[in-house]
Amino acid sequence: MRNKRTATITWVKHYNFGTILQAYALQQYILYLGYENHILNDTYIIEPDQKKSNIFFIRVIQWVKLLLNPSFKLYYKNKVKSKKLFIRFITDYLLIDYDTDWRLFDDKYDQYIVGSDQIWNPGPIWYKELNTPFYYAGFTNKKKISYASSLGVSAYPDKHLKQFREYLSDYKYLSAREDIGCKIIADITGKEVTHVVDPTLLLPSDNWRKLIGEKPTSHEKYVLAYFLSDNKYYLDYVRQYASKYHLSLKMFHNLKKYSCCADELVAAGPLEFLQYIDGASILFTDSPSQKIKSIRDFAQGCFSF
């Protein structure tokens, strides 16, 4: 008897550390359970013509910024390098189905798993992109479940309720990453919704250690900062801490204004992200604690704002 063939629907087109690591962790856990699994490629969900148009204007804006602001050059250089590292990680560590013809999926898969991350975010920034049957497995009548799917909001917009309810009407199992998400989905669908942990917490530390490799042998001691928000207090705090203990300050490149604030602006993909945490004397972050709880333990210390 062959193993059940499963497909995961999540984000892999957004080069975000947490997004890609949750996709990796969930797939590894599914494979551990004995199922076959591929992540469906969502890179070309946006209409090709629209995507090409967007890319053109984005590049024009980037070149203008490079000319007007020299500090942006370092940020942009790191961004390009980081993107390459993300692509390498996705290629090397994720099993991806790059087929874009939805009609062929049911011939390949027996069951669909949707999640995690903010795959069902109804906010104005995301809704236009996410309001497609693809992100709800609406193209199939086969069994579908959600795992740790997040809404990213505290209340669901009334104007989208009917469609959201229809999208989830035939799900066999629903779960969410946050308590508020469980309540919202349960109220809308009338179904039981289970509160589950982020996929990164499904893997024990040994799995992450195997991925990261041995602890670095470098004797360099440094403070590592990973901030999702633009907060002057956070920045001043870590700079003062590094200065007080005579440590270099390394920061990930994700916020442009930090380009000149660190001793080293780090370009990283998911693997390098973990390795830098592993080698840090202390990690400062404002990332939700659950998202990187099992990962941040590799740092000798961690401080969450």
What are these regions (language model features)?
Residues 6-17, 21-166:
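Aromatic- and Gly/Pro-rich donor/ligand-binding loops
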Residues 295-305:
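Catalytic binding pocket for nucleotide-activated donors in carbohydrate/polymer assembly enzymes
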Residues 23, 30-31, 185, 274-279:
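Hydrophobic alpha-helical packing residues
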Residues 114, 176, 284-286, 304:
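Short beta-strand scaffold positions
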Residues 95-109, 120-128, 141-142, 148-222, ...:
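A nucleotide-sugar donor-handling region in carbohydrate enzymes
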Residues 193-201, 205, 254-291:
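Donor nucleotide-activated moiety binding/catalytic core segment of transferases
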Residues 143-153, 185, 227-229, 233-269:
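Catalytic donor nucleotide-activated moiety binding site of glycosyltransferases and closely related
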Residues 39-41, 146-148, 172-179, 249-253, ...:
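Short internal beta-strands
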